[in-house]
Amino acid sequence: MSEELQQKLRSQLWTVANTLRGNMSASDFMYFTLGFIFYKYLSEKIELYANEILEEDHITFKEVWNGKDEELKQDVKEECIQNLGYFIEPEYLYSTIIELISKKENILPSLERSLKKIEDSTIGQDSEDDFGGLFSDLDLASPKLGKTADDKNKLISDVLIALNGIDFGLQEAGDIDILGDAYEYMISQFAAGAGKKAGEFYTPQEVSQILAEIVITGKVRLKDVFDPTCGSGSLLLRTAKSGKADSIFGQEKNCLLYTSPSPRDMRRS
């Protein structure tokens, strides 16, 4: 990712975060912002993938779901779950929620169903543990979002609209790098405002680099790297990269951080 694109992405992300900043603490709006970023990513990822596998049939993902070919729907769903680990029907996509916003509708019930549907799609699958409780920290009924239902709806709608203008480069080979950079940048910014509490989910890059250098001192290559409280995974991955580790292991009780791009990459290693 070019430095220009990186700076543009970070500027857009921080603009989104500022929409929530006045309503809640840094750690609270971190969970909302990162949760919605990941929802957008998952939605765009699956729509792109589904359209690609349907290309030879000259039909789009949304067109299939508007049709009556139940066998084709099931085939698409199974292939998505097998290769992506989850499934989202078109009516629960991020883009569909944006359409509801444009119609001035109350999106909160639909948004809540959409987030739950993503988790439910993995039940009984190998990816169930990865997605279980993914959006559990997104309390759309929280009084921190506003006093009335209309206030909450407007605030969340504003955040989703702002995020909608962000391009995560899904059609590029480095899409995970772009999303991972977005996560690390946002977490670092939230950490700056969270004070001492930030230590539970983020280790500053400078500290991570020093710790990584200490760990690999006198070693040419690391066999395994393990972090029992890996948070967002930034320290673990930095150490693994510096030490050219063969395997990476981490534990994290916070669902949102556990399922962020860094730990997901970590589990694939």
Can you name each region flagged by the protein language model?
Residues 34, 143-145, 233, 252, ...:
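A ubiquitous, low-specificity "background" feature that marks scattered single residues
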Residues 197-261:
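Conserved S-adenosyl-L-methionine
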Residues 1-215:
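Non-catalytic, mostly N-terminal accessory regions of nucleic-acid modification and defense proteins
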Residues 262-265, 269:
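Positively charged, low-complexity/disordered segments
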